[in-house]
């Protein structure tokens, strides 16, 4: 069983909560205007994680056949339990378990930077029909300003994170995290190099600002709690990334401190005391044709 990514790189809770926000129906038109997909298409998501994008695709294209693929068993199990009509399979992005020309669309989100380009693009081109569409979403440097009540860290917390920092970096390096990252010029050139034509580049800004009245109270709380989930999952991963480096008592104390801070942030939101903390995700979207 392969749980390496979900255990040591990005936990289920963090991945699912962040992707559900980014692929909320609130942003549907922004995505679909650039995707330009036909109803009834057979769509393969490579590196589907917990299935948040697959579920969004099924909502946005109800007659589509949506298939999600990931190498992490925990992600696939989670996605299968929550499927809304999609199919999920375990597999490798560089050895897709599908016949030539079997999909109309391939799509990936924050995957290309972790996979060797010739295999990544070559396999997608193989499983696409002639005229099929390859969509690639890649996170670019965005903006993040946490609320002051969340940003505060005690000396106790700073010492522990300094203690395990090298272990987290090593885990990322050992699993090839970001090993094949390409810049905004190199990505479209790579797509062309490996056989795609009519390559387009677009950029989407996803603004997650809880205090913006554009969002409902439920959405605002989800934004705050997604950041909480990320911080809590980082603590939970400590034991698998740096075994024995931090005692359970100290990990429990870290959890209490994180929850206290985010509880304060939620209380400020409920009281109408705006903090204007923001996470703005910038996504580069590429579209190419076989």
Annotate each language-model stretch with its function:
Residues 139-229:
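Conserved catalytic/acceptor-binding region of the Class I
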Residues 44-46, 50-95:
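Class I SAM-dependent methyltransferase SAM/SAH-binding core
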